Amino acid sequence: MCSTNPGKWVTFDDDPAVQSSQKSKNFPLENQGVCRPNGLKLNLPGLREFPSGSSSTSSTPLSSPIVDFYFSPGPPSNSPLSTPTKDFPGFPGIPKAGTHVLYPIPESSSDSPLAISGGESSLLPTRPTCLSHALLPSDHSCTHPTPKVGLPDEVNPQQAESLGFQSDDLPQFQYFREDCAFSSPFWKDEGSDSHFTLDPPGSKKMFSSRNKEMPIDQKSLNKCSLNYICEKLEHLQSAENQDSLRSLSMHCLCAEENASSFVPHTLFRSQPKSGWSFMLRIPEKKNMMSSRQWGPIFLKVLPGGILQMYYEQGLEKPFKEIQLDPYCRLSEPKVENFSVAGKIHTVKIEHVSYTEKRKYHSKTEVVHEPDIEQMLKLGSTSYHDFLDFLTTVEEELMKLPAVSKPKKNYEEQEISLEIVDNFWGKVTKEGKFVESAVITQIYCLCFVNGNLECFLTLNDLELPKRDESYYEKDSEKKGIDILDYHFHKCVNVQEFEQSRIIKFVPLDACRFELMRFKTLYNGDNLPFSLKSVVVVQGAYVELQAFVNMASLAQRSSYAGSLRSCDNIRIHFPVPSQWIKALWTMNLQRQKSLKAKMNRRACLGSLQELESEPVIQVTVGSAKYESAYQAVVWKIDRLPDKNSSLDHPHCLSYKLELGSDQEIPSDWYPFATVQFSVPDTCASRTEVRSLGVESDVQPQKHVQQRACYNIQVEIEKKWIKIDGEDPDKIGDCITQ
C-alpha cells in the first residue's frame, strides 16, 4: 500500500493471513466511527524492542483501535502503531511489554539534521505517482482535487511563509490518509468542520462536542503522537515538493529568458549583477618551486573597470582589488580539466605592451611585437556565468577613459584595423529567420609619432548626404545604415554627428575598441543550414542533425567566391537526466562517449540498434562535454575538402533511457551553432578612407571577420506506443 522507504521509516504491509476483525462490544461511544485496521501489520526496522512475553507479530486479528481523546495523546492503544497485549494500563512513561516505541522527530531548525533543504529531500517518503505530472507547471499538472492542509501548531505563519509552505500544493498526505486502515481523530481539514473518513466512500461522521472543545495545542503536545508524526511527514514532503516546483519554475523561466534574449537588442548586452562565483588560480603567477591550484572566490566588476575579489559572497571588504586600464585584455577562452569528470572554462586577464624590433631575415623588416604579462587567471564551471563575465569586462574596457602616456617615436608607423561582425539569429525548424541582428566592433592598434589625429570613413549611407565627394559611383556597392553606435572616449563625437567622419586621437601602442554599431541583416543566405530532429518512442530517444552547404545559386553576389567556414561548433543541449547515459565507466576514470568521423554513418546506411548510446558523425568529431552540458559537434572547416559541395553531413546519437519519465517536457528546444568566416562582413561594412592628418602616411592594415551565433529550433516527433498516455508528451508532434 505504501511505497518502499529507507530503513528507518514506518511501513505497513498487507497480511493475507489476517482476517477481518470482529467488532468489539466494549467500544466507547465516541470510537464507533473509527475505521478498521483491514489486517495490517507493522514493520519497524531498526527500532528497539523491550523484552516481553507476548509478541507484536502475532497472527491474531487486531481489534478496532480504542481511542481516548483526553487521556491518550499518542497513537491509539489498539492501532497498528501499538500492538494490544493485556488490559494492564501500565505506568506513565514506561512502554508496555510487546509494544514498539515511536521516538519523536526533532524540531526542524537551522542546526537540526532534519532541517528542510533540497539536499535532504531524498530521505522523504513519496507517493508512487507520475513525476512528470507532479512536477510540471500548472498547464501540465494533474487535475485531481487537492485537499487543503493546515500548518502545524509549532510553526507560526511568518515561519511558514519563509519556508514556502502552501496548503494547496500537496495531495500526498491525503492519499496516505485515504489508504490507511485506521483513522486518527487528530486528522482535520482546515476551512471545514472536523471529520474523518468511514469505510463507505463519501460518508462522513462528525466529532463529538467534547473533542471540539479540546484545546488546540493538545493535539501536538506529545511528540510521540501519531498526529505529530503525520504533520512532520506532511510538511517535510511539502517543503520537498515546494523546492522542486520552485526549481522547475526557475529553470523554465531561465530557459524562456535565454531563448528570448539570445538576439541582443542593444549594443551592450551585459546586465547589472551582484557578482559571480568564480575560481582563482593560486598563486597568481607561475612559480617553478610550487604548484598551482584553484581557489573559490566571489568576483565583482564595478563601473570604471574595478575588479573586486572576495573570499565568499556577503563579505563587506574584498581581499583584493584590481583597476583595469586600456592596456588590459582578455585572452582566448579555454576549457581545461578541473576534476576527474569535470571541466572548467578559463580566461586570463593580461597586460599587453608593444615594443618595436628589427628583424633580419631575407630582408630587413621592422615589427611591433607584444609583451604579455599575466595578471589573473580565472575560471568558472558555469558556462552562462562565464560568458556574462567576459561580456561585462569587455564592455567596461571600452568605456575606460584614455590614458595619457608619453608618446614613443617609431621608426615604422602603422595603423591596423580589425572589423568583427557578430551576427545573432534565431531560425525556426522550417529554416526561416524570425529574429536577427548584427553588431559590428572595430578594433584599432596604432603606432603613430606625435599627437596626430586620425580619420576613418565607412560606407555609411549618411556620408554622401553630408559630402558629395564620397558618393559611390559603383552601383553594385551598397552602403550600410547605422542604427545605433557608441564610440571610445578618444573619438570626437560632435565631428561625426556633423560630417559622419570618425576623427580620433589614438592610444599609443594599445589595441582598443574604437567603435561599435548595430545594423540590420541584409537577408543573405547563410553559408550552410542546419536541420535537427529528435524522435521519442517510449524511453528511446534519437537525435539527428543534418548540415547542408548553400549552393552557388543561393549565395548572393556580394559573397562572391565560396569562402570556408572555420571552427564550427554545434551544441545540442542535454537534460540532466540523460547525462549518466552519455558516460562510460572504466577502472581508471569516467569518460564521455566520443565519436570521430564515421563514414558508415552516411545517409541511407543501415545500423543495428545497440543497447548502449551511440554517437555517429560523417565529418568532424562529437562528444558530450560537461562544460557545456551538451553534445558538441566540432568541425574544423566547411565545406569539407574530402566531400563535394552538395553532400550533406549528419550527426546521430541514440539513447535508451531507463524510463520515459526521464524525458522532460521543458527540454530546451534549440541547438546553438557557432562559426566564423574570415575576410568577410555580415553587415557589408567597408572602409572608404583611413589615415592621419599628415603628409607622411603610416602603413595601413584592415582585417575583417564575421562571427555567427545562431539558434536553430529542434523539431520534436513522438511515436506513440501501446498503452502510452499522449498527454504527457507536451508539445511533441505525433509522427
Curated annotation (Swiss-Prot):
Ubiquitous. InterPro entries: Adaptor_comp_med_subunit, AP2_Mu_C_sf, MHD, SHD_dom, Stonin. SUPFAM superfamilies: Second domain of Mu2 adaptin subunit (ap50) of ap2 adaptor. The keyword Cytoplasm applies. Keywords: Cytoplasm, Endocytosis, Membrane. Residues 1-35 are annotated as: Disordered. Residues 412-715 form the MHD domain. Residues 275-408 form the SHD domain. It comes from the Eukaryota. One of its GO terms (cellular component) is AP-2 adaptor complex. CDD domains: AP_stonin-1_MHD (cd09262). Transmembrane segments: none annotated. GO terms for molecular function: clathrin adaptor activity. May be involved in the endocytic machinery. Belongs to the Stoned B family. This is Stonin-1. The gene is STON1.
